[in-house]
Amino acid sequence: MSILIDNVSKNFGDFQAVADIRLEIQPGNLVALLGPSGCGKSTLLRLIAGLELPDSGQIWLEGQDATRQRLQERNIGFVFQHYALFKHLTVAQNIAFGLEVRKTPKAQIKARVEELLELVQLAGYGGRYPAQLSGGQRQRVALARALAVEPRVLLLDEPFGALDARVRKDLRAWLRRLHDEVHVTTIFVTHDPEEALEVSDTIVVMNKGRVEQVGSPVEIYDHPESAFVMSFLGQVNTLPNSPELFPQLSEAVREVLVRPHDLSLSVQAGGPALAARVERLMYLGWQVQAELVLEAGQPLIVQLSREQADRLQLRPDQPVYVQVRNPKIFPAVAADKQLAEAAA
């Protein structure tokens, strides 16, 4: 099902949670609403669900104005971060709940529950209670319950936020496979850039109630339209506006940002480079993170493979030279403000 958010705004008292957002979601897409706490992503999800009503603008579902429709009329499945399963009901009864409310024939309910238990890889668990399941299993039951009524849209509000890191990583790979099987238009809220990059077809980056950028994971990561987007999606370094490195920047009105993996090191001078000193080396499995200090005292982070670090024989206090690849250039005043927002 297609979704059109047409200039929607929502205020809570004096606080503007969503500010004049226009967003179009294609049928069958898996979309991540990504941003920091308080950016409006969960409010936008609740507006789509019908749990909140907009102060202005319209919400269109499959070409029909659904702005004032109730949740029950929109045929939307909603999964919360904390599962919200009925503790006194078995797994099968939890999944069947929505179908029973709709007075679906018992034979159909039984067949649908068995089908969904297979789909979410919980066949044989129908007779268990939520307390007998792990967190990851409970979240899969919640997803099965949402899918039971064959919703036109599936909405997930930070569905893996309450789980530990390993389970979260396993479940998001499973969610991607599940989506590829059922092809339901799905929107999920997350503050985790890695989760958004790994799972989604489209990422919507939000900040202060507004949409900063919409695009595929590759587009968002490789071609950020603002310093906020670039810094929220991973570590960045702010580089000095050096005429030797960036001769095209004639005025000191630009901010030059670069990711740690787009910097390379050498122990000998040669070509355009920044002189620096190794302050600390952090060994992170196959990767080494080198914390440097430039001549002007500015910190810099460089990510290297173990092989590269071993070949350079890096050590603390060693002088090195930093070459820059793929820098991104933004207006300085806006970039300073956005970097502070992304770090907040």
Swiss-Prot record:
Recorded catalytic activity of this chain's protein: sulfate(out) + ATP + H2O = sulfate(in) + ADP + phosphate + H(+); thiosulfate(out) + ATP + H2O = thiosulfate(in) + ADP + phosphate + H(+)
Record membrane topology: Peripheral membrane protein
Keyword Magnesium part of the UniProt annotation: no
Enzyme Commission number(s) from the entry: 7.3.2.3
Subcellular location: Cell inner membrane
GO molecular function, one term: ABC-type sulfate transporter activity
Chief location: membrane
Limits of the ABC transporter domain: 3-233
GO BP annotations listed: sulfate transmembrane transport
UniProtKB keywords: ATP-binding, Cell inner membrane, Cell membrane, Membrane, Nucleotide-binding, Sulfate transport, Translocase, Transport
InterPro entries the UniProt entry points to: AAA+_ATPase, ABC_SmlMolc_Importer, ABC_transporter-like_ATP-bd, ABC_transporter-like_CS, Mo/tungstate-bd_C_term_dom, P-loop_NTPase, Sulph_transpt1, Transp-assoc_OB_typ2
A Pfam family hit: TOBE_2
Record's function text: Part of the ABC transporter complex CysAWTP involved in sulfate/thiosulfate import. Responsible for energy coupling to the transport system.
Protein name: Sulfate/thiosulfate import ATP-binding protein CysA
Organism whose genome encodes this protein: Gloeobacter violaceus (strain ATCC 29082 / PCC 7421)
Lineage: Bacteria, Bacillati, Cyanobacteriota, Cyanophyceae, Gloeobacterales
